[in-house]
Amino acid sequence: FAKDAQKSVMEFLLINHPLDCPICDQGGECELQDVAVGFGQDVSQYVEAKRVVFDKNIGPLITTELTRCIHCTRCVRFGREIAGIRELGMTGRGENALISTFVDECVNSEMSGNAIDVCPVGALTAKPSRFAARAWEMIQHKTIAPHDCIGSNVYVHTLRGEIIRVVPRENEAINEVWLSDRDRFSYEGVDSEDRLTTPMIKRDGKWQVADWDSALQLVADKFKAAAELKAQQSAAEQAAAEADDAADEAPTEAEQAEAVETISAEMAALVSVNSTLEELYLAQKLLRGLGSGNIDSRLRQSDFSDQHIAPVMPWLGQNIEQLEKLDAALLVGSNVRKEQPIANLRLRKAAVNNHAQVSFLNPRLYDFNYPVANNIAVAQQDMVTELAAIAAAAFKLSGNSAPASISDAVSKATVGESHKAIAQQLNDAASATVILGNIAGMHAAFSSLRVLAEAIAKETASTFGYLTDGANAAGAWLAGAVPHRGPAGSKDDIITGQNVAELTAEKLAACLLLNVEPDTDVANAKALMATLND
């Protein structure tokens, strides 16, 4: 009886389903195909005309073949229950039922591509990879998404050495089975015409194609010459210092001016936090081996005043899956929905399932796809004052006094109802966290934000962490790609150097840029470009 019922249901599902399997991108990995083979009939009893539905253009990422739709509404439920954005819905009834966007708008959320994965048929497929390859032709490669600090697990599917598509790889501890559109579709940039495919050397003001040996030798010669000059200058400075000590005289103004005009022998390396751990480690080892500690990966940061007391590495302070178990959270300087979409899904689960009190302090109002307890938006220069007010409320709850480093800011803060509410929610929660986001890391008073946020976390017994810029900021610190520490946070016997802000005012003899576009990736890009062009 059960099998007969299943066969009958399959007949209904297949009544209007077209025989598109030979040309459908879902062919070979289609759930409807699998179920039809197991429970379907060899011959259909249906002889009437099949339903035809005109396809909708719902954006540049998803292709619709709505005649194939079996009205399971998985895509609708994903938007409503998981993503928190109702972009797709079903209109009409019976045979006239139709999956579509509301008011014929485009699907443009940060997680829209997951509708492709949950669709059991070929009604929703990836537009960039349409008709590019069959599922069984492609080779599957495990890798990690490189666009944020979450590190979503993915599969890259290739055909004859060409990337065809990227799909999520299940990992319950990180991205579960979901993937952001940025991680899913960014592979299209791999074959961009703007990318270099061969080394180039500028000769007489023009870029010329070169072979690898010539390019690498040129770079090695320039850094070697700078290192030799630096060694000579260091020896001369030491000899001059010894002579001054012997004569017990300070250098004259003329001697000081002459020293300033000396040809610069400073070397530097600016490395991207999207680089691999191996690249970052080798870059700092190369530069320090040449006698310079001027290496930095914190390219978007401008306040380095507290780097001497910073942790070994900036990290979340908890497991990613712990985010969905929170009862309260305060995110400072974070548009987490766009910057770390997978982390935002976890916070949404906490807000919807646990009724967690999630609060934000930002320089502008951002849209979030879950209930927000407190959403404070102030001018960027007022963020420290607002955070100090929350800290004041937290100290009042704990009964402790603020440490000397922040006592002045806390005592002058004007505490409002929203500040009290945030502190109370963190204090009352069984599981709470305070997190600094990308915007906080780029703030001109980042050190003040950090010390205040840490104080709030301590007084309310919350965890403290960072949602960092790029894919591998923590790895960059661990690898020693910062000027004040070596690998694994070591401080002993390490050649220290200048941070990126100081280097923008420095004359450089040689500079290594690793995965960096200096005119867009650096906080003070204008000053750096002037330094590099000097």
Q: Could you describe each region identified by the protein language model?
A:
Residues 14-18, 65-66, 72, 76-77, ...:
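Catalytic alpha/large subunits of respiratory electron-transfer oxidoreductases
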Residues 32-58, 144-158, 218, 227:
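Flexible inter-domain linker/hinge segments
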Residues 49-56, 86-99, 302-304:
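Short, conserved phosphate-binding/catalytic loop or strand-edge motifs used
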Residues 88, 124-125:
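Short hydrophobic beta-strand motif reused across regulatory alpha/beta modules
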